Amino acid sequence: MVICKRCKLLDATLVSRKEPFCDECFVKFISLKQRKQMMSDDYFQDIFKISYPDKKRGQAEADKQNQDSNVLVPLSLGSSSLAVLDILNDTLLEQKQTHRGKTGFHVEVITICGQAEFEEVRGKIELLKSKYKENSDKILFHIVDRNQFFAVPFDLQEITLYIDNFNTLVRSSNNPSTTVEKVLASAPNKTAKEDLLNIIYTHLIKKFALQRNFKAILWGHSMTKLADEVISLTVKGRGAEIAGYLDDSSLDSKYNTAFRNFHPGRDVLLSEIDAYCHIKGLSQFSHNYVVQDTLFYDKFVDKPTKNVKLIKNMTMNELARQYFDNIEGDYSNVISTVVRTGAKLSNPDNELNQIMHCSICNAIIYKNPVNWLDGITVSKPFVIHNEEELTNYNAWEAANPDKAEKLNKMSDTPAKNVGVCYGCITTLTGMKDRKLEWIRRDDKAELTAVLQEYEIPSDDSEQ
């Protein structure tokens, strides 16, 4: 057997970054990486450290800072978010033990899900509550239905893309039956579905953080996840969002500069997160994800005998993830290079006269995508020049009356550009009838519209 290189006492169970680890040393290795990020600057130190009276503040001020230091953890029940929560729980326990019951921060956990998966998700959350019962006063759980995205007190809108000039027309929509499921059913492919779902989940999470005055959102993204997101954003025409996506040092300007986004797992590979979850027994809490055994000497995951998912059926994120999964073992430095390079990017120069946000994803539009697309594409139909072409067109019109009527209607309707980014224009291009039912953003309404949660039974009662 190989001996652990850290403690030099126990047998190694896995190898990471070409170094053999025993279980105990590896858990400490991963935990310290997250805790190092938690102390990365003064803002996060003020959140996670216990405040005591000093020359600058009295006892009351110190206690208030400890009480107000609350963070939100979006829990997808994948390995990365489970690991982030587990390390926070261990940190709280250590603070209680070493500071006579005091802690420096509070944690609230939010899980977004659909109605179809609610019962399974609720069961997983109940198990987690039981596991972390020693911190039941410091860790609170919330489950929110993803259809709360449309259950808001302000108007819905129907956004239509006109392919001949890439402009968008918006009409008010009072459709009470609009749901996330119906919107996804109109999406052209898995990449578009994933893109829209990511926008919906992100908005719900950040809205929750804004309403409840959280200091930070702790996103459970590994280094591998961040790398595949950098590549995917680039391919999907959302490269301008990379700088903001990886920014842990600024308050979120799109949500009233109320909180910071934070990625405590940005120095840890997904395979390392999976190994941590297996050692700590967190695999039982995962949902729609199988913890992998990539780093372990003794394998425990049944490998499929054939490639189940074809490349043509994969989303852009899945393709990027597959690539990084394949190189993690021998070329993990490529993953860290992608993340470091993305973190060095800054926001593009704004070429518009004002700050404009995309009506769909809320990203800042730095350059008019309509003008850019108009310069590189030919979207208008070829002009009819002779009798033969006119005869062919009339024959097509007679054979396709519905399409012809729709085409004429779209051509006659004046287009109005309401501000949609290039990435969302790409998504709209493939939507059914190039239409999308969406919310009309209103900052004041965002603050007053409280998200409704599913009820989770307390520890001492059943509901």
From Swiss-Prot:
It holds the Pfam family CTU2. The keyword Lyase does not apply. Pathway: tRNA modification; 5-methoxycarbonylmethyl-2-thiouridine-tRNA biosynthesis. GO terms for biological process: protein urmylation; tRNA thio-modification; tRNA wobble position uridine thiolation; tRNA wobble uridine modification. InterPro entries: CTU2, Rossmann-like_a/b/a_fold. One of its GO terms (molecular function) is nucleotidyltransferase activity. Keywords: Cytoplasm, tRNA processing. It is found in: Cytoplasm. GO terms for cellular component: cytosol. Plays a central role in 2-thiolation of mcm(5)S(2)U at tRNA wobble positions of tRNA(Lys), tRNA(Glu) and tRNA(Gln). May act by forming a heterodimer with NCS6 that ligates sulfur from thiocarboxylated URM1 onto the uridine of tRNAs at wobble position. Prior mcm(5) tRNA modification by the elongator complex is required for 2-thiolation. May also be involved in protein urmylation. Belongs to the CTU2/NCS2 family. This is Cytoplasmic tRNA 2-thiolation protein 2. It comes from Kluyveromyces lactis (strain ATCC 8585 / CBS 2359 / DSM 70799 / NBRC 1267 / NRRL Y-1140 / WM37) (Yeast).
